[in-house]
Amino acid sequence: DVYKRQLLFGVVAGISRLVERKESRQKMQPFLDRAGEYDVLFLGDSIMNTGVFPMEMWEKYGIAGYNIASYGNTLPITYWALQNALDYAKPKLVVLDVQGVSKSYKLSGNSSDVHTAFDCYSISKTKIEALDDLMDDPNAVDDDGVAYVDMKWEYLFTLGKYHARWSELTDTD
C-alpha cells in the first residue's frame, strides 16, 4: 500500500515536471544545481533582473553571484523568493531592489509572475508558508479575475495548472 502511494506520487511528480512551464526551472536550475557556490544573491523586479549581471562581477572581481530577480515581483514575492532560496544557499550578501516598497498589494495581476518565482522550488515548509502568506486575501485576483486564494494548490502541485499543456510539448520538454 505504501509502495503504491510512493509510485503514484512519483508518477504525478514526473508528469507535473514534464508539462510545467519551463521559465522558472530554466532561470533557477543553474542556481539550484550550484546553490552553495554563490556569495551574493540579487532579488527584486524587472529593474534588478535586467540591470545586474553577476557574470561581470565574477569576471572583474571573482565574486560568484546569482540573479533571482524576476519581472513583476512585488516586495512580498521577493521576500518569499529569498526565503525559498535560503533553503538552498547561504550567501554572504543579499542585494535587494526595493523600488516596489510603496506598492500596497502582495501580488501583481499576472499569475505567471508568481509561477515564475515559485514553480522551480520543491514543496517545502517555506514554499507552503509563502503561498499561505501571499494568497491570504480573497479579494486579490489575477488578470483573468480568478482569486489567488483559489489557485494556491496550482502553485504547490503544478499539474493542476499545466495538465492541458500536452499539445504544446516539444522535444525539449
Regions found by a protein language model. Give the residues of each.
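Secreted/periplasmic serine-hydrolase-like ester/acetyl group-modifying domain
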Residues: 111-173
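Basic side chains
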Residues: 27, 90-92, 152
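Membrane-embedded segments
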Residues: 43, 47-134
